[in-house]
Regions:
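Residue-level recognition of oxygen-bearing side chains
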Residues: 20, 29-30, 108, 140, ...
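Alpha-helical scaffold segments in soluble metabolic enzymes
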Residues: 33, 37, 83, 111, ...
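Nucleotide phosphate-binding site architecture
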Residues: 12, 22, 142-143, 186
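Short glycine- and hydrophobic/aromatic-rich loop-to-beta-strand nucleating segment
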Residues: 133-137, 177-179
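Conserved alpha/beta core of the MobA/IspD/sugar-nucleotide pyrophosphorylase nucleotidyltransferase superfamily
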Residues: 143-205
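Nucleotide and nucleotide-moiety/phosphate-recognizing core
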Residues: 1-99, 103-131, 163-170
Length: 205
């Protein structure tokens, strides 16, 4: 079983509001869209949230995701990642996804999960020479993932185990686009080859 781990415990301070609850043009909150896409591509998914994010947690539960509350979320992404993987220690592999990346296609996620099922140790999509998200790890990395902490996230493992990484070449610019601020939602309208412009915020200039 491949389990998706959605990292949704960040503060989102640069956005100027609760980023993951911000509605896209179709009315779906940004973070929920990311969760739905992840769940469509894996066997099950867990959303890692802060203890105070009860509204977000409820929306994720309604979307079909399990919830892992991370008491150490303020310490950084590594703590959130370790929390999520620890909630599914018996999985055959984990797909690590970011909740502020709502434009990754479900079929891309499904294909990355497929690489893990086919025996890849680490897998990630690549678009026009650039590696994106989500990143998948096989079960052999359980100890490494659950030992992460602070801001030491998956990138630190990729640096050490670069030779084990198998890329999925894809025509999906969404794997590279994370939403840090409201300007990012406007900028995606000008992304070459993007097929998600209609999903961006209707009110962006």
């Amino acid at each position: 079983m491949i389990t998706g781990i959605l990292l949704a415990a960040g503060a989102g301070s640069r956005f100027g509001g609760d980023k993951l609850l911000f509605p896209l043009a179709d009315g779906v909150p940004l973070g929920v869209k990311s969760g739905r896409n992840l769940l469509d591509g894996v066997d099950c998914a867990i959303a890692v949230v802060r203890l105070a994010d009860r509204v977000l947690a409820r929306l994720y539960e309604e979307a079909g995701l399990r919830i892992a509350y991370c008491p150490d979320a303020a310490a950084g992404m590594g703590a959130s990642l370790a929390c999520g993987v620890s909630a599914a220690p018996d999985a055959d592999g984990w797909l690590i996804a970011l909740a502020d990346m709502p434009f990754i296609r479900a079929d891309t996620i499904r294909s990355v999960a497929g690489l893990l099922r086919a025996g890849a140790s680490i897998a990630a999509p690549r678009h026009q020479g650039r590696r994106g998200h989500p990143v998948g790890f096989a079960k052999d990395f359980l100890h490494d993932l659950t030992s992460l902490g602070g801001d030491r996230g998956a990138a630190s493992l990729l640096a050490v185990h670069a030779s084990s990484l198998q890329h999925l070449e894809c025509d999906d610019p969404g794997i590279l686009i994370d939403i840090d601020n409201r300007a990012d939602l406007a900028n995606i309208r000008h992304t070459p080859g993007a097929d998600f412009r209609a999903q961006s915020l209707a009110g962006c200039p």
